[in-house]
């Protein structure tokens, strides 16, 4: 959530910057709500002041032997008017809160302009795509040949956009997740966390999925529904919700391996083949909680940690800086890592790394005590995939495939595969 004080004092500038994210800030509605809030607040304060004066007059009148009944009636009337004004003020404040809840984060100054993914900017490229002396297959064909991927059975069990993995491909999937966790905890200094896969609405509000993106979520039935997490970013970042951290606790780096669940409501007809876009998929998620002056550098570090996984797997990839129109709701700046998939002949997203600055922290009341001022201030939060496990498996399958349809196991994964060097 944006700082309301800043929105009030820099309204035109806020609207200009939000336009970079293709968001139209409704200045007229905001100013109308603000004008009502201020007017009602002044009226409430005046009524309170008048009530206090009348209450003091009662004591004086009583001591003087005067009839206090008229004063009591006045105080009661003022009390009723003040109560009505406070109710009206709460109603307007709720409208303002709902208005603010729907406003996305401001983009950083160096975010490139643009309307869609076509306007994203390639930042760097690592590795060279392999030249095959045969026509490379995609992961679907490879998985079917190896009898390790079964989409038909998954559809029978659940619905489309699910997968069943068996044998050495299931093991490869597990090995990738374990390798990622070990790299991040042992080499990059993250603390591993196990988190709930179901969370409440307040938790999803904190990270920005609710109220705007409810259609993308799976929820339980009943009066107090829970939601399946779309990413471990949600519970992991909220571990510091409603908390004032000591300076010594920062920076905090967390890593989680969880399944993720998304309805893909806006993805009809996109990536219907294979595992690229699933309702259920595994992801190793990285979360940073840092001091405000550290978040710019923290984004570079977090992105580098995700890149290291791809480098160790020797998978060609590129880093793109998302333009304003392609950025997520909570993000101030985002890098996407896109891995080369020979079966598709193009780069595909495998990680998205974002700095949300104090946007999520304000929504979830996550603060730290600034040692210079002694006062609580919002922390900055960052998140990124390190990596999406299923897409990493796809990349390994397609980049390490052989002419006979077998798949060589990357060197760094062999210890996790029990010595298996080739999946066939």
UniProtKB/Swiss-Prot annotation:
It catalyses: tRNA(Ser) + L-serine + ATP = L-seryl-tRNA(Ser) + AMP + diphosphate + H(+); tRNA(Sec) + L-serine + ATP = L-seryl-tRNA(Sec) + AMP + diphosphate + H(+). One of its GO terms (cellular component) is cytoplasm. The keyword Nucleotide-binding applies. Its main location: cytoplasm. Gene3D superfamilies: Bira Bifunctional Protein, Domain 2, Serine-tRNA synthetase, tRNA binding domain. It is found in: Cytoplasm. ATP binds at residues 262-264, 349-352. InterPro entries: aa-tRNA-synt_IIb, aa-tRNA-synth_II, aa-tRNA-synth_II/BPL/LPL, Ser-tRNA-ligase_type_1, Ser-tRNA-synth_1_N, SerRS_1_N_sf, SerRS_core, tRNA-bd_arm. GO terms for biological process: selenocysteine biosynthetic process; seryl-tRNA aminoacylation. L-serine binds at residues 231-233, 285, 385. One of its GO terms (molecular function) is serine-tRNA ligase activity. Pathway: Aminoacyl-tRNA biosynthesis; selenocysteinyl-tRNA(Sec) biosynthesis; L-seryl-tRNA(Sec) from L-serine and tRNA(Sec): step 1/1. Keywords: Aminoacyl-tRNA synthetase, ATP-binding, Cytoplasm, Ligase, Nucleotide-binding, Protein biosynthesis. It holds the Pfam family tRNA-synt_2b. Its EC number is 6.1.1.11. It comes from the Bacteria. Catalyzes the attachment of serine to tRNA(Ser). Is also able to aminoacylate tRNA(Sec) with serine, to form the misacylated tRNA L-seryl-tRNA(Sec), which will be further converted into selenocysteinyl-tRNA(Sec). Belongs to the class-II aminoacyl-tRNA synthetase family. Type-1 seryl-tRNA synthetase subfamily. Homodimer. The tRNA molecule binds across the dimer. Consists of two distinct domains, a catalytic core and a N-terminal extension that is involved in tRNA binding. This is Serine--tRNA ligase. The gene is serS.
């Amino acid at each position: 959530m944006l700082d309301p004080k800043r929105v009030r004092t820099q309204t035109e500038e806020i609207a200009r910057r939000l336009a970079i994210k293709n968001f139209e800030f409704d200045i007229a509605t905001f100013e109308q709500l603000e004008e009502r809030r201020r007017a009602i607040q002044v009226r409430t304060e005046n009524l309170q002041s008048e009530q206090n004066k009348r209450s003091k007059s009662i004591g004086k009148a009583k001591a003087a032997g005067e009839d206090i009944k008229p004063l009591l009636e006045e105080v009661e009337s003022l009390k009723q008017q003040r109560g009505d004004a406070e109710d009206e003020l709460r109603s307007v404040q709720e409208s303002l809160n709902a208005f603010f809840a729907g406003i996305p984060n401001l983009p950083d100054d160096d975010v490139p302009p643009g309307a869609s993914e076509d306007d994203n900017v390639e930042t760097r490229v690592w590795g060279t795509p392999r030249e095959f002396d045969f026509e490379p297959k995609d992961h679907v064909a490879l998985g079917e040949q190896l009898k390790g991927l079964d989409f038909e059975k998954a559809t029978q069990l659940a619905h489309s956009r699910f997968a069943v993995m068996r044998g050495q491909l299931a093991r490869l999937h597990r090995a990738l997740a374990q390798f990622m966790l070990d790299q991040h905890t042992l080499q990059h200094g993250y603390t591993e966390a196990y988190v709930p896969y179901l969370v409440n609405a307040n938790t999803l509000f904190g990270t920005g999925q609710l109220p705007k993106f409810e259609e993308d979520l799976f929820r339980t039935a009943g009066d107090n529904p829970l939601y399946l997490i779309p990413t471990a970013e949600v519970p992991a970042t909220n571990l510091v919700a409603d908390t004032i951290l000591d300076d010594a606790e920062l920076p905090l780096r967390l890593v989680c391996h969880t399944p993720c669940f998304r309805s893909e409501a806006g993805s009809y007809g996109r990536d219907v083949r294979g595992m690229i876009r699933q309702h259920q998929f595994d992801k190793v998620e990285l979360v940073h909680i840092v001091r405000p002056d550290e978040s710019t550098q923290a984004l570079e570090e977090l992105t580098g940690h995700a890149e290291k996984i791809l480098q160790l797997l020797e998978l060609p990839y590129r880093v793109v800086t998302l333009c304003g129109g392609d950025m997520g709701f909570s993000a101030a700046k985002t890098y996407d890592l896109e891995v080369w998939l020979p079966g598709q002949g193009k780069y595909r997203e495998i990680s998205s790394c974002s700095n949300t600055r104090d946007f999520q922290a304000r929504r979830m009341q996550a603060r730290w005590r600034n040692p210079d001022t002694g006062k609580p201030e919002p922390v900055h939060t960052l998140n990124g995939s390190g990596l999406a496990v299923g897409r990493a498996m796809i990349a390994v399958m397609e980049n390490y495939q052989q002419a006979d349809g077998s798949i060589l196991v990357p060197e760094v994964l062999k210890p996790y595969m029990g010595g298996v060097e080739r999946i066939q």
